[in-house]
Amino acid sequence: MSIDLSLPELPILHPRITVVGVGGAGGNAVNNMIQSNLQGVNFVVANTDAQALEKSLCDKKIQLGINLTKGLGAGALPDVGKGAAEESIDEIMEHIKDSHMLFITAGMGGGTGTGAAPVIAKAAREARAAVKDRAPKEKKILTVGVVTKPFGFEGVRRMPIAELGLEELQKYVDTLIVIPNQNLFRIANEKTTFSDAFKLADNVLHIGIRGVTDLMVMPGLINLDFADIETVMSEMGKAMIGTGEAEGEDRAISAAEAAISNPLLDNVSMKGAQGILINITGGGDMTLFEVDAAANRVREEVDENANIIFGATFDQAMEGRVRVSVLATGIDGRNNKSETSPISQSEDSEKEKFKWPYSQSESTQDKTLETKPAEQVSEGAKWGSNIYDIPAYLRRKK
């Protein structure tokens, strides 16, 4: 009689990272990441515009607010985007509920991204994703917002709407990275195409996700786990992220200096950062002295009391080159952590309806229409108009 002894197969345990692209800008960012073949990430797109969803390269699509918008878009009205996300919140949660980490990317200043992104972030914060691959317990989803602000040529109306959207989104995300589209002019030239410029902005999101995933899944001498990432990013407010890659003499220093001077981000400095995540990647020829030089160059930029988490990974495709990725959190000089949950802190403000400009209640709107000449009233302000009868692509031409 033979006894067949076999070891049980170990389950594949790894953090589940989800990226949700909200609205047109968010959907474009997801398309660019899919085209760049970013691995280890679950992609989802959510939009009120059915035509935009049809063109998406993403397999997982959420049509926001079918009853509210009929698939015709939000008409640049954030309240419509918010209502559409609230209508579809159950479907949204089906896609994100088992995530350990959630990236929400959107463009601020329009309707869907500005209104829906905070709703999704709030749902993620209130949810408690079961971490089944550890001790059975409930744990919140670590949520990161990566959003853009409008170009200057988009007009004065979109910027205040974008600022209100950022203020609302920051209530619910652990970390927020803001990319002003206007900063694209810092790195563009006269021959840079419009499409290529936006890809540069989308690359910031790509850098952030790759920097996190590489530290946890790439082979290396110093690997980090998800708990390390969470320590630096949980409840940390505004953040900046950068990456640099160099070869030749002093490649480590050059890569580090490029990483800490990202020209796309929103006039932020690492000086007051409370948490720093450093990822140094190189081929088999990367030396100990190079790792030391790159890490110390980044450390020079931050307070000595900052919580610095460091990882070094190997990638044979990086032979002859060194890449340094830096994520600095808590750069607004505050840590949102407190004994009171951010959700309970914001309950009072939630009692009052969050009001965007150009989406007044009917009573306020009537007074506005009486006191302003007709030609000064924006089409978007006419809440009672049949906005949903006009396709989104036509409304955008107005």
From Swiss-Prot:
Domain of life assignment: Bacteria
SUPFAM superfamilies assigned to the protein according to its UniProt record, in alphabetical order: Tubulin C-terminal domain-like, Tubulin nucleotide-binding domain-like
InterPro entries: Cell_div_FtsZ, Cell_div_FtsZ_CS, FtsZ/CetZ, FtsZ_C, Tub_FtsZ_C, Tubulin/FtsZ-like_C, Tubulin/FtsZ_2-layer-sand-dom, Tubulin/FtsZ_GTPase_sf
Segments of skewed composition (Basic and acidic residues): 364-373
Pfam families: FtsZ_C, Tubulin
One GO term (biological process): FtsZ-dependent cytokinesis
Keyword GTP-binding (UniProt): yes
Disulfide bonds: none
Protein's UniProt keywords contain GTP-binding: yes
Single GO MF descriptor: GTP binding
Keywords: Cell cycle, Cell division, Cytoplasm, GTP-binding, Nucleotide-binding, Septation
Region (Disordered): 333-381
Compartments, as annotated in UniProt: Cytoplasm
Binding-site residues, GTP: 24-28, 111-113, 154, 158, 202
A GO cellular-component term linked to this record: cell division site
Purpose of the protein: Essential cell division protein that forms a contractile ring structure (Z ring) at the future cell division site. The regulation of the ring assembly controls the timing and the location of cell division. One of the functions of the FtsZ ring is to recruit other cell division proteins to the septum to produce a new cell wall between the dividing cells. Binds GTP and shows GTPase activity.
PANTHER family given in the database record: CELL DIVISION PROTEIN FTSZ-RELATED, MITOCHONDRIAL DIVISION PROTEIN FSZA
Assembly and oligomerization: Homodimer. Polymerizes to form a dynamic ring structure in a strictly GTP-dependent manner. Interacts directly with several other division proteins.
Family stated for the protein in its record: Belongs to the FtsZ family.
The protein's name in its UniProt record: Cell division protein FtsZ
